[in-house]
Swiss-Prot record:
PANTHER family with a match to the protein in the record: PEPTIDE CHAIN RELEASE FACTOR RF3 (PTHR43556:SF2)
One GO CC term, this protein: cytosol
CDD domains, per the entry: RF3, RF3_II, RF3_III
Cross-referenced Gene3D superfamilies: P-loop containing nucleotide triphosphate hydrolases, Peptide chain release factor 3, domain III
Positions of the tr-type G domain: 10-278
Protein family (similarity comment): Belongs to the TRAFAC class translation factor GTPase superfamily. Classic translation factor GTPase family. PrfC subfamily.
UniProtKB keywords: Cytoplasm, GTP-binding, Nucleotide-binding, Protein biosynthesis
Source superkingdom: Bacteria
Provenance organism: Neisseria meningitidis serogroup B (strain ATCC BAA-335 / MC58)
GO molecular function (one): translation release factor activity, codon specific
Role of this protein: Increases the formation of ribosomal termination complexes and stimulates activities of RF-1 and RF-2. It binds guanine nucleotides and has strong preference for UGA stop codons. It may interact directly with the ribosome. The stimulation of RF-1 and RF-2 is significantly reduced by GTP and GDP, but not by GMP.
Name of this protein: Peptide chain release factor 3
Protein residues bound to GTP: 19-26, 87-91, 141-144
Length: 531
């Protein structure tokens, strides 16, 4: 183990931002970059008319709608650390891509709209984080507006999300009367002023909750704050680092992302408390981040990040060792060595060539169709990293095209979008139409839009009479062949070459499972494992 690798791993922080749609996640992403000095002017999401688009929302459909559809990756330096920030799609229809992003991070920042509290998508995403005991930092956003009672919000997080809260800052007022926050651990008051262009050193700080200056500034609010702090300290949890790292307790911060307020405290907490890259499970052994040899896995494939180049980029999370440009690395699923000379790092759509990368870093490998989600890379050791699943889709459409001469483009487009994980593609064993499976309706809209923009294909989706899909496998090849023959009308092959049973309804699935007890029906499948 080299000291250089160990030092670099300790400097890394890799986290994702998770939230329900419209809680202010993309704005917060922008502001974190602004505070770190990575960008000069944050393009807030709402001002679509101004033509200032958020750094992290780059695909055409995102620009039109103001929602993050593809998860973006941004790297920046802050306080002698290298931060890898993964922005995830907040829209509820994108739970699959979001889930996969959460397999590549070591901690998460949960953004809650304080006017609304805990919402459906937040619950889903937190459950995904819980599968891996991911440490969570919480930001209660939008205190410059009228919001719900702060104690009530903490109760809701604890009761619904089943994670204990430890307030680190506490709001003074809200909406028009929002005066700032009190930092409980530092015994400091940060005074709020509206305006999105302010940087951290431009906010006033008053030392001590008993400072007489506070009575002069806002006598009513300060008394209320003192009463609330007494109550909070009696009723809620103190911050405990070990409990945070175990995913059992979340430090809570309050503020207003659009006004740059409360951002620096979050950044500091992620640097000071969030974990450096952790060991990773592979099929043969546990891989430590400070091992000398390079390894990593693909958690996402993005087609056409640059409309000028019809390219695809595979996003790789480095798990161990040191990546150096030009080094030889092995693509383990197809047992092929590649020379990594044109690997890139990201600031959303701005790409730079990578000279070196360490555990926790996200690098982009140009993909000409050989790389799939879940693939592992190493310097030669047969490591297959685990824990990157596909979910059985819940919605299905059959797809046809208006111009039959473009069938090749359609097939190519769907093959690429299927590998990228934008949608699941099934080719029925009988019948010519391809079937698309998704977790939410918006995914179909994205596919329609991308087929038109990127592949020049006008596709029409028709509803398909399918209730759910299950991947099927059986150790007994003879039994599997009998099953295939008897159920040919309901079987299809997915983009990864796996056999799937498309059930028209719940009853049919139940009866088929009873009739064929030797066949295993899977609700999820590992990306890197062929069933």
């Amino acid at each position: 183990m080299s000291q250089e690798i160990l030092d670099q791993v300790r400097r890394r922080r890799t986290f994702a931002i998770i939230s329900h749609p419209d809680a202010g996640k993309t704005t917060l992403t922008e502001k974190l970059l602004l505070f770190s000095g990575a960008i000069q002017s944050a393009g807030t999401v709402k001002g679509k008319k101004t033509g200032k688009f958020a750094t992290s929302d780059w695909m055409e459909i995102e620009k039109q709608r103001g929602i993050s559809v593809a998860s973006s990756v941004m790297q920046f330096d802050y306080k002698d650390h290298t931060v890898n920030l993964l922005d995830t799609p907040g829209h509820q229809d994108f739970s699959e891509d979001t889930y996969r992003v959460l397999t590549a991070v070591d901690s998460a920042l949960m953004v809650i709209d304080a006017a609304k509290g805990v919402e459906a998508q937040t619950i889903k995403l937190l459950n995904v984080c819980r599968l891996r005991d991911t440490p969570i930092v919480t930001f209660m956003n939008k205190y410059d507006r009228e919001v719900r009672d702060s104690l009530e919000l903490l109760d809701e997080v604890e009761n619904i999300l089943k994670i204990r809260c430890a307030p680190v800052t506490w709001p003074i007022g809200m909406g028009k009367n929002f005066k700032g926050v009190y930092h409980i651990l530092n015994d400091e008051i940060y005074l709020f002023e509206a305006g999105g262009e302010r940087l951290p050193h431009e906010f006033d700080i008053i030392k001590g909750i008993d400072n007489p200056e506070l009575e002069q500034r806002f006598p009513l609010e300060i008394q209320q704050l003192r009463d609330e702090i007494e109550l909070v300290q009696a009723a809620s949890n103190e911050f405990n680092l070990d409990e945070f790292l175990a995913g059992e307790l979340t430090p809570v911060f309050f503020g207003s992302a659009i006004n740059n307020f409360g951002i620096q405290e979050i950044l500091n907490s992620l640097i000071d408390w969030a974990p450096a890259p952790k060991p990773r499970d592979a099929t043969v052994r546990m891989v430590e981040p400070d091992e000398p040899k390079f390894s990593g896995f693909i958690f996402k494939i993005q087609a056409n990040m640059d409309p000028k180049h019809r390219d695809r980029i595979a996003f790789l999370r480095v798990c161990s060792g040191k990546f150096e440009r030009g080094m030889k690395m092995k693509h383990l699923r197809i047992n092929r060595e590649i020379a990594a000379s044109s690997v890139v790092t990201f600031m959303s759509h701005d790409r730079e060539l990578v000279e070196e990368a360490y555990a926790g870093d996200i690098i982009g490998i140009p993909n000409h169709g050989n790389i799939q989600i879940g693939d592992s890379f190493s310097e030669g050791e047969q490591l297959a990293f685990t824990g990157i699943p596909f979910f059985a889709p819940e919605l299905f459409r059959s797809v046809r095209i208006k111009n039959p001469l473009k069938i090749k483009q359609l097939q190519k487009g769907l093959q690429q979008l299927g590998e990228e994980g934008a949608v699941q593609v099934f080719k029925p064993m009988s019948g010519a139409d391809l079937i698309l499976g998704a977790v939410g309706v918006l995914q179909f809209e994205v596919v329609t839009s991308r087929l038109a923009n990127e592949y020049g294909v006008e596709a029409v989706f028709d509803s398909a009479s399918i209730w759910s899909a299950r991947w099927v496998s059986c150790d007994d090849k003879k039994k599997l062949a009998e099953f295939e023959k008897a159920n040919a009308g309901n079987l299809a092959i997915d983009a990864g070459g796996n056999l799937a049973y498309l059930a028209p309804n719940r009853v049919n699935l139940g009866l088929t499972q009873e009739r064929w007890p030797d066949i295993v029906f899977h609700e999820t499948r590992e990306h890197s494992v062929k069933l």
